[in-house]
Amino acid sequence: MGQALSVTKVLNAKFHTLEFDGEWLAAVGQPELTGSWMVYGAPKNGKTTFAMMLAKYLSRFCRVAYDSLEEGLSQSIQMSMERVGMKEVGGRVVLLDKEPFGELVKRLHRQKSPDVVIIDSVQFMGLTFDEYKRLKTAFPDKLFVYVSHVAGRQPEGQVAKRIWRDANVYFRIEGYRAFPVSRYKGGATIDVWKEEADRYWGLEES
């Protein structure tokens, strides 16, 4: 049975929040280090590069693992890391080379395991919703960011859609621009590639 908490306890509760600033504060607010986020969009719109930008920014606050199930250790992943200047973060971001669900769970049970895990993608991991709930329950002090393909303008598949509905923050990527929705306020867009975003959205200078 769950706890019944008084209003005073609820209002006095403290949470582990990340002190975002600049464009990330404007986009997301000051989020908790818990639960799930989602990044979704069509191919060739900047989705992977944005996920790398997010990994780099989150590494200012904690350790980040990027589980690349689609591409693994590859030239395209290397190029994405170079594009966002990932060299600056040192050992605070690690790439997991196509690590499956079971191995990821074992890793997260170790001491000094990553605080944030980016799973790229929901579809290539073959994640079930029960496994998703298991991660949330077993690791309540970690943040999971799920990258998803799309069908139309929504995440592809029932599992991805259920994660999307449950996520505290999600970013829709289109035309090299991220459109966030956050339970922590925010809401301002972030450009993955400003020149291409302006061209796509018809804002380029004449």
What would you call each of these model-derived segments?
Residues 137-206:
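Phosphate-binding/switch region of NTP-binding enzymes
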Residues 34, 61-62, 114, 141, ...:
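Short, well-ordered alpha-helix to beta-strand connector turns
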Residues 45, 72-73, 101-102, 122-127, ...:
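Short acidic, S/G/P-rich loop/turn micro-motifs used as interaction or catalytic elements
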Residues 1-15:
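Charged, amphipathic alpha-helical linker segments immediately N-terminal to NTP-binding catalytic cores
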Residues 15-32:
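Pre-Walker A adenine-sensing motif
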Residues 57, 82, 110-111, 134-140, ...:
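Short, surface-exposed basic-aromatic patches at helix termini and helix-loop junctions that form
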Residues 33-102:
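Conserved P-loop
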Residues 95-147:
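Phosphate-binding/switch loop-helix module in NTP-utilizing enzymes
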